[in-house]
Amino acid sequence: MNRKILFSIIFTILGLAAFQISISHIIGSSQNFTLFELLGPTGGMFLGPILGAISAFFVKALNVIILRQPLDFLTIIRFLPTMLAAVYFGLKQKKTAIIFPICIILFLLNPIGRQAWMYSLIWLIPFVASFGKKRLILNSLGATFTAHAVGSVIFLYSFGLTPAIWISLIPVVFIERGFFTIGIWTSCLVFNTILDRLTDFKAIHFLKPLVNQNCLVSTKFFKSFA
């Protein structure tokens, strides 16, 4: 079996388990952020941007099916934030920064968004961070803000909320995305290290090429890639 397909299956199973663990409530919604928000984007590094996004899609879709929720257009389009976060995390090119100006423009084109224009300025932070993607912490920050920017635009056009609520969320975003940045950074480092150790066993040694050698705990990592 192709190593990436096998790893995709493993990742999907782990993702479904992570999806069952809630970590915070999504303001303005009846849903919660789950542990998968921290694990989901890392699939882009191990599987590549496309397969990482597909794996994130399957995790979300299977979770909806298992919970017998309606799999309608709005539900599917809300898969995009995590999928694009995986794409961002998996791509090395700085061109991924384009997602943030696009989201800012889409946010400001909305009448409610224009009244809460300062909310969209938050995305200038990950835009700048995109030019330092070699660093895992900056790549993690960009990935979680990719999910945030895309998710916010979808939420704005789907549910609205008042300008006052959007503005009041600004300090919450900094705390929330700071936590998610550290969470993605930690998840990636731990997952990569465990995979590196497990692939020392002959039975799964063929998965070794999926290990990111730059993201293993070492002096070199903290000096150049952390």
Predicted regions and their residues:
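Loop-helix junctions at membrane interfaces
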Residues: 1-226
